[in-house]
């Protein structure tokens, strides 16, 4: 009877933490639930801290705006094994002061997303480049603090980079992008969108050096022309997706060879666009065959 009573009174925290709770239960809970569990009791706080110390992925995308910066520092203060760190939606509070210690003690990071973190500075990117030699994926969209020197540091130290999002990094010009292309030959995905400084020079350098390129986003790169798109078609046989919306100097003459290779392009062919426009303006939907 005593044994049965013990079984009946067994509680969740009585299970082995590192053998059962962490690998088979906590790893499936969203971060916001883990944060809530920390407040239940001292034991739960200790359990969650053990989990956070050993977790490989830390994603603040869903709770970024609501988490205090002090909580962020506390949760990751002992973690030295992170492989992936996402700070999207943390723009209101994350600064170099909070991020630099985390980057400095996590040299195995392969994926870092700082997109939209407007309060960071170039020091954070330099820290990533110096600490994270195994970095493969980097998100810097809308980080206007990214400059040529910090990007060059990244290129010098993270040659294994496979994808980088530089959307709206408007300080960057052709010289920085060309340097990146010459150093990071394994790039498969690149966004240079919303940057009027980018010209054919950047696109051609990327095409000639990054032969395994699969995805390229040039949305809003107003100075890109047909010549660089033709170079892209010549040197990048693995290209799968190209975005050139609002690239007014890129025409169908350079896009057609890519379409014939089934590359997904975000602008319709001229005839298709004309038919859709006619359909919208005149309301002839039942009479127009858009498969012409």
From Swiss-Prot:
Family under the similarity heading: Belongs to the FBXL15 family.
Protein name: F-box/LRR-repeat protein 15
Subcellular location: Cytoplasm
Subunit structure comment from the entry: Part of the SCF (SKP1-CUL1-F-box) E3 ubiquitin-protein ligase complex SCF(FBXL15).
Chief place where the protein resides: cytoplasm
One GO cellular component term noted in the UniProt record for this chain: cytoplasm
A Pfam short name: F-box
Any single biological process term in GO: dorsal/ventral pattern formation
Name of the gene this protein is made from: fbxl15
Protein task: Substrate recognition component of a SCF (SKP1-CUL1-F-box protein) E3 ubiquitin-protein ligase complex which mediates the ubiquitination and subsequent proteasomal degradation of target proteins. Acts as a positive regulator of the BMP signaling pathway. Required for dorsal/ventral pattern formation.
Keywords recorded for this protein, A-Z: Cytoplasm, Leucine-rich repeat, Repeat, Ubl conjugation pathway
Residue stretches making up the F-box domain: 12-59
Source organism: Dicentrarchus labrax
UniProt LRR repeat ranges: 134-155, 160-181, 186-207, 212-233, 238-259
InterPro entries per UniProt: F-box-like_dom_sf, F-box_dom, Leu-rich_rpt_Cys-con_subtyp, LRR_dom_sf
Involved pathway(s): Protein modification; protein ubiquitination
CDD domains for this protein: F-box_FBXL15 (cd22126)
Highest taxon in the source lineage: Eukaryota
